[in-house]
Amino acid sequence: MLTNIAKKIFGSRNDRLLKQYRKSVARINALEEQMQALSDADLQAKTAEFKQRLADGQTLDGILPEAFAVCREASRRTLGMRHFDVQLIGGMVLHDGKIAEMRTGEGKTLVATLAVYLNALAGKGVHVVTVNDYLASRDAGIMEPLYNFLGLTVGVIISDMQPFDRQNAYAADITYGTNNEFGFDYLRDNMVTDQYDKVQRELNFAVVDEVDSILIDEARTPLIISGQADDNIQLYQIMNTVPPHLVRQETEEGEGDYWVDEKAHQVILSEAGHEHAEQILTQMGLLAENDSLYSAANIALMHHLMAALRAHTLFHKDQHYVIQDGEIVIVDEFTGRLMSGRRWSEGLHQAVEAKEGVEIKRENQTLASITFQNYFRLYTKLSGMTGTADTEAFEFQSIYNLETVIIPTNRPVQRKDFNDQIFRSAEEKFEAVVKDIEECHKRGQPVLVGTTSIENSELVSHLLQKAGLPHNVLNAKEHEREALIVAQAGKVGAITVATNMAGRGTDIVLGGNLKHQTDAIRADEALSDEEKQAQISALEDGWQAEHDKVMEAGGLHIIGTERHESRRIDNQLRGRSGRQGDPGSSRFYLSFEDPLLRLFALDRAAAILNRLAPERGVAIEHNLLTRQIEGAQRKVEGRNFDMRKQVLEYDDVANEQRKVIYSQRNEILTSKDISDLMKEIRSDVVSDLVDTYMPPDSMEEQWDIPTLENRLAAEFRLHEDIQSWLKADNAIDGQDIKERLIERIENEYAAKTELVGKQAMADFERNVMLQVIDNQWREHLAAMDYLRQGIHLRSYAQKNPKQEYKREAFTMFQDLWNGIKFHIASLLTSVQIEQNPVAVVEEQPIGNIQSIHSESPDMEELLGQSQTDLVTEAFNPDGTDFSPEALEARGQIVHRNDPCPCGSGLKYKQCHGKLA
């Protein structure tokens, strides 16, 4: 009550912000005539002037009015588009690091140019993030003439681009790309072994288009770079035969082997189900007699069984995935797009492959990962645009510290949003949908039908075919035709059936998108220039008449075939109609068989329906029901927010560790001299080893000197008789032992360094350190995954799972860091270097490395290169081909036991002959 009174007196926070922005708009508008009077050359010179003013200490905020005025005028000259006042407000919202909520058709792509131009002047790079490669390329192509006119360069990052091209794209002033590509490049940059292989610059400023889709819908999906792990493919096939033998129970307390919690998206085995599954697995020979699935040795079996059950009960073809070219391709539940290249983790993808009888690919092991939540929080400044952010404003504020500002439309919205119509069954609902479409088609009103799955879009398409109604289907299977279909969805009588329209990125223009049609004519090579011009002229003449006819028919009519879990997705579908003051309408058709109504058991609504509409095919519509349904959606949104927040809380633990590892890795990559760091590592490792077997403040009787000597010999090739030291000097203690051992190791290491040269040794050290860190980090990520999967069980012991996870993760990270230091010290101190008897030191200083030996069986694995590879690199820096074929072509005859012609000193069969 008091809040409402205060809002009436002082206005809302949004109103106050808009008031401030309008003052700046007035200053920008005051400069318009001045900018229009400038020649092209003078207008272009403004960019250099702004850069100089920034270099002289002026701030971006200080030059904002002039920069926005310049960008607006340049846009008018190059693109033929002038920014409206509300678009100027949107640009300022983005510059301030906030989210601009702008309705569909309000020109978000043009709005971004203002903030992008201003921030690009700082020379630190600006990233414009879109949801797919098509939109990234399209938006960059549309806006490049504007940016180039203003003296700025534009790059585009798309999948399958080579590293060199990526470096060039990131070096541009403005870089367009998808959230996936930006995130994966960040991870790949933190896996390189040479700093010059990195592609990204510092993460400065990002403008995220469809920000709700990227930062909320995809927040639960981490970006993962992975490699194939050892996996038993046959086990997935065998486990696939088990679910059909188990009985599904209707409720948690019912009779059967398992029940499905659709709300939580989980499958739970009952006690009887465990026993039944154990019997089946015992008969198959996978489980020993009287053994349990709960025993530690059978965790893998349990893992595969639950994956198979989830694949059979929770994941459905043409809803959650499609089969394309013999592969399982995931369908994005929010947009209906195919997510090629994405795979479910924890063996689920393999279980679905087994269910569908396609080739099963090995499960992957995580090499590097990050969530979008943590990736985008790395930017110095982050902003976003969307048509629907207000419903998620709290989440944007609490997780990303992003305030949402609702930008008023340039023209009032005239769309009519009718109440939902609710039917008993899905069959009755779809009959009503077809009837509504038929009526619209008769009066020439275009219709967009939104469905939540590919299965439903194909069902609607089938019903329309039976009714003889021509239509287009737009779902994940028709991805390539997507933009063309959407562009023409506003033509007279057009019927378009589409899975969720979120993120489609193309405006529906009443009367059809004239530009798309004229572009298609211009691209038709079969037509002469005269024919093209004639067709374009005829098209332009007829377009206005068609546009007027659609306006008279009521504009675009939106039909939703069911409510989505998120109100935001429903609003995005509705928002396709009524763009820029156009007329339009929307209505949702629901049934009590729809997942949302079924799962949230709207008993009261069902009772009302039975009382008010007893006849078949009769629907009810009432504000009370609509509010109840929105209440159910709020429950789901709240639950999903809690899940995303929980993912973030757990990932924040790994994120802090990731920052430490990546920071250390970067320091190693960029430091010219790492000798001090190496010395510190050797000292720490020796000290820890001595403390382990000679604990500080302990009695001499508690010391384990023989084991210490054995460890030093095995791990560091250090053969020291410590026991004789102790006999010779009774006063000696652990600290003295440490100092002597460190001195011996340092002397030996200095001798090796002198033998091969300081730079060669530094390069070798750097390579070893990076390989060790990467391998140890990879194993640590796997261990963290296992910890995360089972940590919820701690709650049964009255412990807080999150606190337990943090505590154990911290201990594991300490062990990881100690393990990294130990492996680095062990590998580098145990390496033996022999002087090359052939090569002349003065001529080939790097040639001193002849061969590298190590007692450690992990040497080759940890280095990632064999001894031969390292020697070959050293003696063949220009990549000369010494294969038998190449030597024969050059007229050289080299036998297997002859010295390798590369100069390594090794026999040919042990060097390039081995590689061949």
UniProtKB/Swiss-Prot annotation:
InterPro entries: Helicase_ATP-bd, Helicase_C-like, P-loop_NTPase, SEC_C_motif, SecA, SecA_CS, SecA_DEAD, SecA_motor_DEAD
Coiled-coil residue spans: none
Cofactor(s) annotated in UniProt: Zn(2+)
Cofactor note: May bind 1 zinc ion per subunit.
UniProt enzyme class: translocase
Domain of life (superkingdom): Bacteria
Gene3D superfamilies documented for this protein: Helical scaffold and wing domains of SecA, P-loop containing nucleotide triphosphate hydrolases, SecA, preprotein cross-linking domain
Pfam families: P-loop_SecA, SEC-C, SecA_DEAD, SecA_PP_bind, SecA_SW
GO cellular component, as recorded: cell envelope Sec protein transport complex; cytosol; plasma membrane
Record's keyword terms, sorted: ATP-binding, Cell inner membrane, Cell membrane, Cytoplasm, Membrane, Metal-binding, Nucleotide-binding, Protein transport, Translocase, Translocation, Transport, Zinc
Residues reported to bind ATP: 87, 105-109, 507
Residues given in the record as Zn(2+) binding sites: 900, 902, 911-912
EC number annotated for this UniProt entry: 7.4.2.8
Membrane topology summary: Peripheral membrane protein
GO MF annotation: an example: metal ion binding
Catalyses which reaction(s): ATP + H2O + cellular proteinSide 1 = ADP + phosphate + cellular proteinSide 2
Assembly notes: Monomer and homodimer. Part of the essential Sec protein translocation apparatus which comprises SecA, SecYEG and auxiliary proteins SecDF-YajC and YidC.
Family, as annotated: Belongs to the SecA family.
NCBIfam families linked to this entry: PRK12904.1 (NF009538), secA (TIGR00963)
Functional note: Part of the Sec protein translocase complex. Interacts with the SecYEG preprotein conducting channel. Has a central role in coupling the hydrolysis of ATP to the transfer of proteins into and across the cell membrane, serving both as a receptor for the preprotein-SecB complex and as an ATP-driven molecular motor driving the stepwise translocation of polypeptide chains across the membrane.
PANTHER family: CHLOROPLAST PROTEIN-TRANSPORTING ATPASE, SECA INNER MEMBRANE COMPONENT OF SEC PROTEIN SECRETION SYSTEM
Name this polypeptide is given: Protein translocase subunit SecA
Gene for this chain: secA
